[in-house]
Amino acid sequence: MKKAIFLSFSLFLAFNLTAQKKPKINKNKQAIITALDQKYDELTTLSDKVWSFEETAFQEKQSAEALASYAEANGFKVSRGVAGIPTAFVAEYGSGAPIIAIMGEYDALPGLSQKATSFTKDPVNEGGAGQGCGHNLFGTASIGAATAVKELIEAGKLEGTVRFYGTPAEEQFFGKLWMIREGLFDDVDVMMDWHPGDETKANVQSSLALVDFMVEFTGQSAHAAADPWNG
């Protein structure tokens, strides 16, 4: 009896697995995936550069310039120092609607210097800054995606404008607020954002609210979004 049940269950699984259709990817999406695969080495090099600069809020001069220069070299019109912030920039290609924007960050965090080859605390510079939230990946992958979309617009396969926002000081001082006040996002139709994490998925997600006040904590520190229960 057990053998019969096991055989039936196995046949059921086999039928369902073979019956599932392979998801179709449209031509434009496949072109973007192919373009990003071809840019793998140069984007990895760019990400490693930003990681090595270890620049904190509003000090991201080399990081911002590396990303802005990459955009410029790939045909984007780049506006540097927007909203009165030397390390903020906007890169744009195309014309008209829709205006599709992609966010990028690149600031490091103080005190998180860490060698890439170690999973235990092993700073490059004791007490120095480091990429604690993967913003070297954030900025680089976003500009890579924008570049791949730009190539489709250039080839006449898409219409509209693709825009990359280089946003400094996400972790401290909130550079995006100053960019919002300047109206830099007012004409955007769709803004896309992402963040390094332990899952690969697309979703709509809420964020922590911000009220500006001073608090002094004692005890064990923890990340407010990722593991508040450990603090």
Where are each of the predicted segments found?
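Hydrophobic alpha-helical segments, especially transmembrane helices
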Residues: 3-4, 48, 136, 177
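Acidic/His- and Gly-rich active-site-bordering loop/insert found
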Residues: 21-131, 140-160
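Bacterial Sec-dependent N-terminal signal peptides
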Residues: 1-23
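General alpha-helical segment detector with a strong preference for membrane-spanning helices
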Residues: 6, 109-111, 138-140, 199, ...
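Histidine/acidic-residue-rich, glycine-tolerant segments that coordinate divalent metal ions
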Residues: 120-130, 136-137, 153-231
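Short, glycine/serine-rich, charged loops/turns that create anion-binding
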Residues: 11, 107, 169
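A generic alpha-helix preference that emphasizes hydrophobic side chains
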Residues: 16-18, 47, 176
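Short polybasic/polar patches that bind polyanions
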Residues: 13, 52, 72, 180-181
